[in-house]
């Protein structure tokens, strides 16, 4: 069961939220990222290891419970943030994190759709990548305008751009050696965009060379069928535009 603190967050926020993966494209956006200090931001997993991050995130979510180190808030330079732990009920609950239930079995965004729009919050289906899974918490909080960054899925991390192995130790970079995984992510984002638009929301990608937008067309090989799933906007242009409430 979700923690009471999570349930109390329902529809307490509005406007836009920037959700960050940990792709090394963030290193090319450092100047623009500094402007996010005045925005609602949701980061995840190994982001806390990027000590040069130019802003302190509003929210932090952890979905990879194998890495106990990530659960220690005191390794992060960004201590003043709300933390969420997404997992199965039988997983160990960390006292520094608000607990959010994850659905068991084959419950996935691409087949079951997003949750968080109604007055009850079901267990979260997986988005096949942490940022999309965590977006459902932001939907529950009331955000409807979303901008994604660092969604590449082809190489290392912002804190370790030359990494040859994923944090989980289960996947070798570049992840385009695993096209089924990337295709599952594409399908999940396509369903998420449609669900969000049906509720009056927007889903935009600000990842240069990303998996989900037109700028990534020349980046993907080895069996990946590139698909332009999300509209692309540069982060600089998004920062300039007026917030839609």
Each model region followed by its residue ranges:
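Metal-ion/cofactor- or nucleotide/acyl-coenzyme-handling active-site neighborhoods
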Residues: 1-245
